[in-house]
Swiss-Prot record:
Record flagged with keyword Glycoprotein: no
Listed name of the protein: Potassium channel KAT3
Binding site residues for a nucleoside 3',5'-cyclic phosphate: 381-500
Lineage of producing organism: Eukaryota, Viridiplantae, Streptophyta, Embryophyta, Tracheophyta
Intramembrane segments: 253-272
Membrane topology (Extracellular): 89-95, 160-169, 226-252, 273-276
Principal place of residence: membrane
Organism: Oryza sativa subsp. japonica
Length: 502
């Protein structure tokens, strides 16, 4: 077959392939049980965990709002802390007041933590003993939380009139310890199916990059500001009186240097002028190597994950086309192959059967009853049988999609499965005098191959779809097993089969 005719088959496959995200953005609710909290085994499993008096549940919506509010304060601290450390020799009154207010909120959170139960990592049970809560907190993050909340600037005023001692400024940087809350927040959001994973991941990468740029620019400016000769600094070489310029000009200049260095643009207009700046530049560029590798690795993983199914799809379709051309298969068979591959990839993306397989049998039975009970009950073969028999039947059935012009059962084959047409269209074909003729068209809700399955003889017709069809399938072994368990229903089925085929 000419290559041009084979290439014309590609448009019939690609439109039905959707590689979009089907995860987080389609869910409006999440599991209604708290993270990491599992009930114990045995008779006590039904007993809900009881909180002691004055304790605050970590899953209380009000506590969640409090944690979200603290995240906003952490973002503020992450921005203002390096800025104060580098640019503000004499801390203005406004940031000083705001910092004390923010420290007050985190001091309240420290006290509140002594009244918040925690989940034990070994038993996965909620520990609500106040003594155990206190011991755990005192032996873990308590010291760091206190150090990040102490108002070191106010303490420095006792030793220095303006409070710009460099040692106390270093201690004030301990407020960056609060960033661990942001890391925990991103880890929690990445597991939340209500949010798109790729968006959360990209937001995290952008946040890390912006914070690194901000800190590097502030530190580099601090080195220039503390250098004895201002003109022999990276900023003093182009702005001799940079200390007299406004805060905004100096901050933008520092961020400009940081970004051009991080991106290895290196225009050369701002560069190190002394040994201190050279040493910091070396350290910053070495850090940039790690940061760039981290960013590229994460972005590559996101892109590869989103395009891997498309790549696999193209490879399989190309292999099928080459196989058909190499073996000179008829165009009809090649179309069936490509349509089947296209449909298989689309249904694999839906992951319907995989979703059902991971569920308990009782839950699968409820879902099957809701979806297929009335369809199976309406088939002529099962008229008059008990509801229990129909329920057993639909539980064992599997829903499949068949592409147009795909053969379900071939004439003279002994079918091993019974099929039920749910939706779509199927032609019943018969070979007469060497030609294929349409005997009739099967209606929705009609059984296919029941005579061959129940009578164990070759099928008299070929069943071929004419458009995309949804079909229920059950194996002959499972069907006969259910009939043997329900002998009265088996007699009804035998009677229905004889009446139709008399």
């Amino acid at each position: 077959m000419p290559r041009s005719s084979r290439m014309n088959l590609w448009p019939h496959c690609f439109p039905c392939f959707d590689d979009g995200d089907r995860s987080g953005n389609r869910f409006s609710t999440v599991c209604n049980f708290p993270d990491d909290l599992l009930p114990s085994l045995g008779a006590t499993a039904h007993q809900p965990p009881k909180l002691r008096k004055y304790l605050v549940s970590p899953y209380d919506p009000r506590y969640k709002v409090w944690e979200t509010f603290l995240i906003i304060l952490v973002v503020y601290s992450a921005w203002i802390c390096p800025l104060e450390f580098a640019f503000l020799r004499y801390l203005p009154s406004a940031p000083f007041v705001v910092d004390d207010v923010v420290n007050g909120f985190f001091a309240v959170d420290i006290m509140l933590t002594f009244f918040v139960p925690f989940v034990d990592k070994k038993s996965y049970l909620l520990v609500n003993d106040p003594k155990k809560i206190a011991v755990r907190y005192l032996s873990s993050w308590f010291v760091f939380d206190v150090c990040s909340t102490v108002p070191f600037h106010s303490i420095s005023l006792l030793f220095n009139e303006h409070g710009h001692d460099l040692g106390f400024k270093f201690l004030n940087v301990l407020r960056l310890w609060r960033l661990r809350r942001v890391s925990s927040m991103f880890a929690r959001l990445e597991k939340d199916i209500r949010f798109n994973y790729a968006v959360i991941r990209c937001t995290k990468l952008i946040s890390v990059t912006l914070f690194a740029i901000h800190c590097a620019g502030c530190i580099n400016y601090l080195i220039a500001d503390r250098y004895p000769d201002p003109r022999r600094t990276w900023i003093g070489a182009v702005m001799p009186n940079f200390r007299e310029d406004g805060l905004w000009i100096r901050y933008v200049t520092a961020m400009y240097w940081s970004i051009t260095t991080l991106t290895t643009t290196g225009y050369g207009d701002l560069h190190a002028e002394n040994a201190r700046e050279m040493l910091f530049g070396i350290c910053y560029m070495l850090f940039n190597l790690w940061l760039t590798a981290y960013l590229i690795g994460n972005m590559t993983n996101l892109v590869v994950h989103s395009t891997s199914r498309t790549r696999d799809f193209r490879d399989v379709v190309q292999a099928a086309s080459e196989f058909a051309a190499r073996n000179q298969l008829p165009q009809q068979i090649e179309e069936q192959m490509l349509n089947h591959i296209c449909l298989r990839y689309k249904t694999d993306g839906l992951k319907q059967q995989e979703t059902l397989d991971v569920l308990p049998k009782a839950m699968r039975s409820s879902i099957s009853h809701y979806l297929f009970f009335r369809v199976v009950q309406g088939a002529y073969l099962f008229k008059g049988v008990s509801s229990r028999f129909i329920q057993q039947l639909v539980t064992e059935m599997q829903a499949e999609y068949f592409a147009p012009k795909e053969d379900i059962i071939l004439q003279n084959d002994s079918p091993s499965d019974l099929y039920l047409l749910v939706s779509g269209a199927v032609d019943i074909l018969v070979f007469l005098d060497g030609t294929e003729q349409v005997y009739r068209r099967a209606a929705e809700g009609e059984l296919l191959g029941e005579i061959g399955v129940l009578c164990n003889k070759p099928q008299s017709f070929t069943f071929r779809t004419t458009k995309l069809s949804q079909i229920l399938r059950i194996s002959r072994t499972k069907l006969l097993g259910i009939i043997q368990e329900n002998r009265e229903d088996g007699d009804i089925i035998r009677s229905n089969l004889q009446q139709v085929n008399v």
